[in-house]
Amino acid sequence: MSAPCHCKHVDDSSSNDKLSALSPELQQEFKDPNHPANLICELCRLFYDNNWVTGTGGGISIRDVDGPNPNLVYIAPSGVQKERIQPWEMFLVELPDEKILRTPNDIPKELTKSYKYKPSACTPLFISCYTLRDAGACIHTHSQHAVMVTLFFENEKEFAISHIEQIKALPKLKYNDETGKIEKIGSMEYYDKLVIPIIENTPHEEDLTDSLQEAIKNYPGASAVLVRRHGIYVWGETVWKAKVYNEAIDYLLELAVKMKLAGIPLVKQE
């Protein structure tokens, strides 16, 4: 369960009134505050307040791991103001065939104002996290801390930091030779070194897919991939784990920028 979001970007009573324009099935579906579509709205508002998804940038996707069909994936659309997004604006995709089951363009026009919604350009990257890491959610932000770190490490292929307490919030992952899957074996410890791969940006988001997949395969211990001069992708086994990992990593990235400016090494030598 999550704490209620207190940000006031959207009038809740107005949103409830608009639900009446939906089919009875969708009205019932969206009444659940923990429905993936509602959680995406909640997190988008929170992330907007953190300056992570401004100017329609960034995106969130959640796989319905607790629902009757864990292959259903809800994805926020492209080009919308994330702090004002509504649950009926999500694209619904079913894995593994990536079949689109529902789009916001199917919703009554009185709700969408005849706006032509487009699938998120992040979709193939989100899908990569689900298929390669069995993730329950994937978050993409345009965090300034993420961008700055990739600039400080302009000629590097990875970011590393150690001996910081916040590292404990992140999972310790290991490749299982028998199952062929990445498994969580615990949490990282204070002395551990966090390593996050950095991939180069491309003119179009979907063109990042191959590089992201390669980074995920080459860094089995990572829960995120930095995109140079762009932002970061973070995933977790549930939406709340992904949220925690994203917050912890952003804290570490912000701290890393300050440490760099102060001339303090990010990786402590034993």
Curated annotation (Swiss-Prot):
One Pfam family assigned to this protein is: Aldolase_II
One GO cellular component, as annotated = cytoplasm
Q: Cellular location of this protein?
A: Cytoplasm
The catalytic activity of this protein is classed by the Enzyme Commission as 4.2.1.109
Report the leader peptide range.
none
Pathway entry: Amino-acid biosynthesis; L-methionine biosynthesis via salvage pathway; L-methionine from S-methyl-5-thio-alpha-D-ribose 1-phosphate: step 2/6
Q: Which SMART domains match?
A: Aldolase_II
Keywords on record = Amino-acid biosynthesis, Cytoplasm, Lyase, Metal-binding, Methionine biosynthesis, Zinc
Annotated Gene3D superfamilies:
Class II aldolase/adducin N-terminal domain (3.40.225.10)
Q: Which cofactor does it need?
A: Zn(2+)
The keyword Zinc-finger appears for this protein: no
What the entry lists under HAMAP family is as follows: Salvage_MtnB_euk
Q: Please give the NCBIfam families that the UniProt record associates with this protein.
A: salvage_mtnB
Instruction: Tell me the protein's name.
Output: Methylthioribulose-1-phosphate dehydratase
State the organism of origin: Candida albicans (strain SC5314 / ATCC MYA-2876) (Yeast)
What is this protein's gene name?
Answer: MDE1
